[in-house]
Amino acid sequence: MAGGSQADSTVRDILATGGKVFMKAYWRFPLFILLSFSAACGGGSMSSSTPPPPVNAHVQIANTVTGPLNLAMSTSFQPAEWDYQFFTINSGATTTLGNLQPQHIRLQGISQGVPQGAAGSASTAWDFNILDAITQPVLSVGDHSPEFQIAKAPPFLYSGDNSGDDFVDTSFQPFATYAQNLVLYYNKGGFAANGQTYVSESPNPITWWGIYNEPNINNGLTPQQYVTMYNTLVPQMQTIDPSIKFAAMELAYFSGQPQAWLPAFVDVNTGVTARVDVMATHFYSTCNQMDDDAKVFAMIKNNFVPDIQYFYSEMATNPALAALPVWVTENNVNADFDAGNGMSACNPGQPFVLDQRGSDAFFAAWRPYVFSQFAQAGVQVLYHWDFDADAQFGEVDYNTDGLQLSYWVDYWLARMFPSASGANILQSSSDDPNIEILAALNPDGSVVIMLANHAVNAPNDNNGPGAPRNTAVDVSALGSFTSGSLLTIDTSTSVTSGPIATSVTPSASMTVSLNGYGVAFLTLK
C-alpha cells in the first residue's frame, strides 16, 4: 500500500492535509482485500488510560552471537502532482533527509509523476518536471543511489488510457520500451523524442530499479503475468545499462498474499529467468484506525515475521534466488487514507480517522519492535512510508519540513545499528514478552542494547500511553565496561531537538525505566 494507494478503479482519491493535496491514482481494490481487512479489524476507540505503577522486568544478555546485524534504514517519496513541491517550499529539506542516513531512498512516481502520457489521453508526450522535482534532490543526498520503482506504465498502455485498468498488451513489450527510456534518461545521456532531447541533470545514475508496485492489487494482474512482465522489462533495461540492479515483487501486504504470488515467481521451470538482486514486500499493521494497540503490535510477530520467513523459504527453492536478501520497501502503522468526503478507503461506510500512532510515542515502541524482529529474520533494508507527509505517515511535515517523533526514532535506529558496521546480534532473554530486546556487539567491543516497551496499559487502548516498565538488564556475561550512555525516546521527547543521551555508570546489572510506550538505547564501551 503506497501510503494508502488502493481504491476502487473508478474512484479518484483526494486527501487534503494542511495544504498538501494527495490525488491518488486509479488503483484496484478487490473485494477479497476489503473482506480480509474487515475480518481482521477490531473495535478499539481512542483512549488514554492512566498507567499503573511500573512492572519490574528482567533481561539477560549472553555473550553468544546469533547472527549478523545487517539491517539498514531508509525512507520513501511518491513524486506526483500532490507531492512534487516539497523540496521547493522547504529549502533545507535535503539536509533533514540526509541526516537520516537513508540507504537507497525509494522513489515511487505515480499519476503525473509518470513522465510520459496523460490520464484519459492517448498522448505519448514526455514531461519529467514533476518526477524530477523530487528525484533530482534525492539523487544529491546520502548514498546518491535511490531505488527507482517503476510503479506504473504510461496511461496510454492501459485500457481506456486509464492507469487503473488492465494493460492493453500483456506481452509488456511497450512497457519495456518505456522502461528503457527511463534508463537512458537517468543513466546514459538521455534520449530523443518528439523533436526534443530528454536527459537527467544529475551526474549520478540510478542503479536500483523496482519492477512495478504491488502487482497483487493493481491492474488485474495475475502472478504469471507479473512473471512475464518482469522477464520482459529487466533484460531490455539491461541492454541499455548492464550494471543496473533490480528489486522484484514489492507486494501489498494482506494475509496469504506471499503464498499466492511467490510460487509462480520462484518456480525453476516457469518462473523468473531475468536478473533479480533483491526480493521486496510491504508491511502495515492495520488499515483501520479502530484497531486497538494490542492488535496492531501483535501483527509484527504473528504476521510480518512469518511472511518474511516464507519469502526466504520460497527463495531457497530456486538456486538463482537462494542467496538474495529481502527488503521491506514500505512500512508503517496504518495504510488507510481518505477516499474522498472524509470516508475510509479500507473500510467502506466508515469515516476516515487520521492515525496518530504513526508519529507519536506508540511509534517509538512499534518501529523499534519491527526493526528488531526484521533484523533477526534477515531483512536487509527497512523503508519508512513515507518521508514527507502528515502525522499518520510522515517523518516530517510536508508543508514545513517540521520533524515528527517518527523522524527521531528512525534517525537513532540508523545510528545505533549502522548496517555496514560488522555488528553481530547477541543472544538475549526476558521474563517480560512486552519488552523487545535487540543487543548488538560491535567490532570494537562496544555493545548497544535496545529495549522497546510495547506493553499495553489497558486491553482496549487505542493510542494509549502504554504501561511503565523498570527493566533490570544483566550484562555480567559480557565482561566489564568503562563508560556508558542511555538514550530514550518516548512521549516526553522533544520533537524539535530530539532525545539527549545521558551518561550512566556500567555495572553487572543496570536498570532502564520506560514510563510507557517508547524505546531506550543502552550503549556500553
Regions found by a protein language model. Name each.
Residues 287-342:
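Glycoside hydrolase catalytic-domain groove-lining segments
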Residues 332-436, 443:
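Aromatic/acidic polysaccharide-binding cleft in carbohydrate-active enzymes
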